UniProtKB/Swiss-Prot annotation:
Keyword Protease recorded: yes
Pfam families noted in UniProt: Proteasome
Species: Methanoregula boonei (strain DSM 21154 / JCM 14090 / 6A8)
PROSITE patterns, alphabetized: PROTEASOME_BETA_1, PROTEASOME_BETA_2
Name of the coding gene: psmB
Self-association and partners: The 20S proteasome core is composed of 14 alpha and 14 beta subunits that assemble into four stacked heptameric rings, resulting in a barrel-shaped structure. The two inner rings, each composed of seven catalytic beta subunits, are sandwiched by two outer rings, each composed of seven alpha subunits. The catalytic chamber with the active sites is on the inside of the barrel. Has a gated structure, the ends of the cylinder being occluded by the N-termini of the alpha-subunits. Is capped at one or both ends by the proteasome regulatory ATPase, PAN.
Transmembrane segments: none
Location of this chain's protein in the cell: Cytoplasm
Enzyme Commission no: 3.4.25.1
Name of the protein this chain belongs to: Proteasome subunit beta
Function recorded in the entry: Component of the proteasome core, a large protease complex with broad specificity involved in protein degradation.
A molecular function GO annotation: threonine-type endopeptidase activity
Broad class of where this protein is predominantly found: cytoplasm
C-alpha cells in the first residue's frame, strides 16, 4: 500500500454499535491536513437511506463523493424495487463500487449501519471493497485503539438507547484525549425502526458530564 495512502488514513475516530432496537453511529469532528487542523466542524456521518447511515474516515473528497454516489444508488434501488434497501445490500453496493476502483482506490474506511426487516446491523467497508458484518461494536480511524478499549470493556448485548449513546460518547472522549487526529466535539446519530436522529448537543454534553464524574 502506498505510503501516502497510509498517511491519509491517520485521522479520525468513528464508532458503530448495536443496541436493543437500533444502531448508534458516532464520530468526532476534527479534520486534519498533515499537522494542521483543517476543520473543527467536519461532517463524518451521512444519511444514505431512510434508516441507514454511513461514517467516513480518510480523504474528505473521496468520502464525500462516495456518500453522494451511494445515496443515489440507494434511492434508485427503492424506485426500481419498490422497497427500502437493506443495510447489507447498501454495504454490498458500496463494496462492489470500491472493488471496481481498487487499482485507483478511494482513500476511505467506512462504517454502514442501520435497521431493516432483519434487525439492526453495522458493516465495516475498506478501500479495497472488503465488507464485514460486525456483531456488536466497531471502530475505525487513528483513534480506534483507544475507542476499542472502552467499547470492549463496557459494551453488553441488549443495552438500551441511552446507555448506548453514553458508551459511544465515552469511547470517543477516550480517543480524543490521546489521538491528535481526533477532537473538536462529538456527533452522534441514533437509528431505529421509527427514526434517524442526530443527537442534540445538550444530550451529548449531559453524557460527557457522566464520563467525567
Amino acid at each position: 500500500m502506498p505510503e501516502q495512502y497510509q498517511e491519509s488514513m491517520t485521522g479520525t475516530t468513528t464508532v458503530g454499535l448495536v443496541f436493543a432496537g437500533g444502531v448508534i453511529l458516532a464520530t468526532e469532528k476534527r479534520a486534519t491536513m498533515g499537522y494542521m487542523i483543517a476543520s473543527k466542524r467536519a461532517k463524518k456521518v451521512y444519511q444514505i437511506a431512510d434508516r441507514i447511515g454511513m461514517t467516513i474516515a480518510g480523504g474528505v473528497g473521496d468520502a464525500q463523493q462516495l456518500a453522494r454516489i451511494i445515496t443515489v444508488e440507494c434511492n434508485l434501488y427503492q424506485i426500481r424495487r419498490s422497497r427500502e434497501i437493506t443495510v447489507g445490500a447498501a454495504s454490498t453496493l458500496l463494496s462492489n463500487y470500491l472493488n471496481q476502483n481498487r487499482y485507483f482506490p478511494y482513500y476511505v474506511q467506512l462504517l454502514v449501519g442501520g435497521i431493516d426487516d432483519h434487525g439492526p446491523s453495522v458493516y465495516s467497508v475498506d478501500a479495497m471493497g472488503g465488507a464485514t458484518k460486525e456483531e456488536d461494536i466497531v471502530s475505525t480511524g487513528s483513534g480506534s485503539p483507544m475507542a476499542y478499549g472502552v467499547l470492549e470493556d463496557r459494551y453488553r448485548p441488549g443495552m438500551n438507547e441511552d446507555e448506548a449513546v453514553e458508551l459511544a460518547v465515552r469511547a470517543l472522549r477516550s480517543a480524543m484525549k490521546r489521538d491528535a487526529g481526533s477532537g473538536e466535539g462529538i456527533h452522534v446519530v441514533v437509528i431505529t425502526k421509527d427514526r434517524y436522529e442526530n443527537v442534540s448537543e445538550e444530550t451529548i454534553k449531559k453524557h460527557l458530564a457522566k464520563t467525567i464524574a
